[in-house]
Design a protein with these regions (language model features):
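Residue-level recognition of beta-strand->loop/alpha-helix junctions
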Residues: 30-32, 72, 147, 210-211, ...
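Cys-nucleophile CN-hydrolase/nitrilase-fold catalytic domain and related Cys-dependent amidase chemistry
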Residues: 43-50, 54-139, 143-145, 154, ...
Length: 356
């Protein structure tokens, strides 16, 4: 073979490697575990999560292998105490920790990526504050940490990182991995299309939902906000959605019941897989085709909302709606309600001004 032909062949092979088709299965796992009231109690939940990872991998092994496994909000720990001080004292942990280390070992064992269930996080940089956090963990370790931006107020008393005046970390991180570009948001975040749009604009191809979505808004008629939101966000952002919902029974997580219904949705809003509604452990698996998604994003001209967005047409986003925190103190039920009242007054005044 002459030098020119050999060079051409190497070029073709190089392009083929770059264009390698990325297709695999994802698993949305929902848990039904007791609610720990201390750090020691978290270990049993983590052990069950590790076992479910083994099951997800084994179940898909004869078919399209699983490469991404997602767990729900509160899978490790939940805000069972009414104040940030109690959560900080009894449940909050720093990241990384023994749980993320165990997950990394499992990710390395199976060559998978794991979106952890959420855990209550403390950080010495922000004394007294507690975050609702989840990590994307791969064989090499933690790829990003996401802290819930839109906390479920007034009840949730963990801190939104957005509210800390000296916070300088990315609010919506995205990880570029061999299985695609992944980004995550937690539960109530998903009712704000702006959050998912920011992840997509940051490059996310799979939008991961770590959630504890309760009745009556959950995964069943007549409301079924769960499915409506998941499908809408997939369509709006031309992205896959892997949504893991809490499947705990009422006795574990009162005062709400948890409808499960974990889902996988494709970038056109098609429901690829869904767990049956109702409490209980479930693992739902579906294929995702990142190469097909990239082709659509590159070639599609119609219904390409990411590129058609006229962001400057929406000046409402230049001003605050929900008021910024005026204190560096952790939130409480009372201060959350005060800020909600202020935000509602601001909205009413602003609406009248805009109409006139």
């Amino acid at each position: 073979m002459n030098t020119d032909k050999k060079s051409d062949l190497l070029s073709v092979l190089s392009v083929a490697n770059v264009m390698e088709h990325i297709r695999y299965s994802v698993a949305a796992c929902q848990t039904d575990s007791s609610n720990p009231i201390d750090r020691r109690g978290m270990r049993a939940n983590t052990e069950r999560i590790l076992s479910m990872i083994d099951s997800a991998v084994a179940g898909a092994a004869p078919f399209l292998p699983v490469r991404l496994i997602v767990f729900p909000e509160f899978a490790h720990s939940a805000p069972v105490f009414p104040t940030a001080a109690e959560l900080h004292e009894k449940l909050a942990i720093t990241i990384p920790n023994e749980h993320t280390e165990r997950l990394q070992q499992k990710a390395r064992e199976h060559d998978v990526y794991i979106q952890s269930g959420s855990m209550l996080e403390s950080d010495p940089k922000y004394p007294g504050h507690v975050f609702n956090a989840t990590c994307l963990i791969g064989p090499s370790g933690i790829l990003y940490k996401y802290r819930k931006v839109n906390t479920w107020i007034p009840y949730e008393v963990h801190t939104s990182p957005h509210d800390l005046p000296d916070y300088n970390e990315p609010l919506f991180p995205v990880a570029d991995t061999p299985i695609g570009r992944l980004g995550c948001a937690i539960c109530y975040d998903w009712l704000f299309p702006e959050a998912m749009r920011q992840l997509a604009m940051n490059g996310a191809e799979i939008l991961i939902r770590v959630s504890a979505y309760m009745d009556p808004w959950g995964a069943t008629d007549p409301m079924d906000w769960w499915t409506v939101i998941n499908r809408a966000r997939a369509i709006e952002n031309m992205a896959y959605v892997v949504a893991s919902n809490q499947g705990a029974s009422l006795k574990f997580y009162p005062p709400y019941s948890w409808p499960g219904g974990s889902q996988v949705v494709d970038f056109d809003g098609r429901l690829l897989a869904q767990a049956s509604p109702g409490p209980g452990e479930r693992i739902v698996v579906a294929p995702v085709d990142i190469s097909a998604l990239r082709h659509e994003r590159e070639s599609r001209r119609g219904h390409h909302m990411l590129s058609h967005l006229r962001s400057e047409a929406y000046p409402t986003y230049k001003a605050h709606q929900y008021p910024p925190s005026l204190s560096n103190e952790p939130p409480s039920y009372e201060t959350n309600n005060t800020r909600i009242d202020e935000a509602k007054k601001h909205f009413a005044q602003r609406s009248k001004t805009d109409i006139s």
